[in-house]
């Protein structure tokens, strides 16, 4: 009997000591679920940023094949390297359970470039991908940096914004150098 009482006391003690851990686990699970539910502006940013980077990377691969201009090829290489890094940073900043699309390039932009070669390609690439693409990216990153609800995504946008702004300036300089309007 005495051993049953000791056993019951030990069991009750173990159950009571486990209760806070169970409550903590439930609280953590609830907060993880809340973190996974991004607000609309953050979801839009993840989509826009991943599409921008995917398009930059894919269009820059085209530029490395279809352009004959050294400056355009150098710009394209720079964009491939930087946007690969930016995509990785975005994936690391996204909350657990939020998928950053791997390859969601803007097919309309890519399709408009595929049939072009030489100077015709260079002009379209500089206009659509270099200048216009980076203007849109700057807007998306600025909006997230100012209005984002998810702290990690907001911080990632703030960190990446100077790079995106530098890309826009590089594209504008390249456009001026090549006489692209």
Segments from the language model and where they lie:
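His/Met- and acidic-residue-enriched segments that coordinate or traffic transition-metal cofactors
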Residues: 2-10, 16-181
């Amino acid at each position: 009997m005495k051993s049953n009482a000791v056993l019951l006391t030990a069991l009750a003690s173990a159950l009571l000591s486990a209760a806070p851990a169970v409550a903590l686990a439930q609280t953590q699970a609830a907060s993880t679920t809340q973190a996974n539910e991004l607000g609309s502006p953050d979801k839009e940013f993840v989509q826009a940023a991943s599409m921008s980077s995917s398009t930059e990377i894919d269009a820059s691969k085209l530029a490395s094949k279809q352009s004959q201009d050294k400056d355009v090829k150098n710009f394209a290489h720079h964009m491939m390297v930087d946007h690969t890094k930016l995509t990785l940073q975005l994936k690391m900043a996204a909350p657990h359970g939020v998928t950053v699309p791997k390859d969601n390039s803007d097919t309309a932009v890519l399709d408009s470039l595929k049939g072009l070669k030489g100077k015709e390609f260079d002009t379209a690439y500089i206009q659509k991908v270099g200048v216009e693409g980076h203007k849109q990216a700057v807007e998306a990153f600025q909006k997230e940096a100012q209005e984002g609800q998810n702290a990690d995504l907001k911080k990632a946008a703030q960190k990446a914004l100077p790079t995106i702004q530098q890309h826009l300036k590089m594209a504008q300089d390249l456009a001026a150098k090549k006489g692209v309007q």
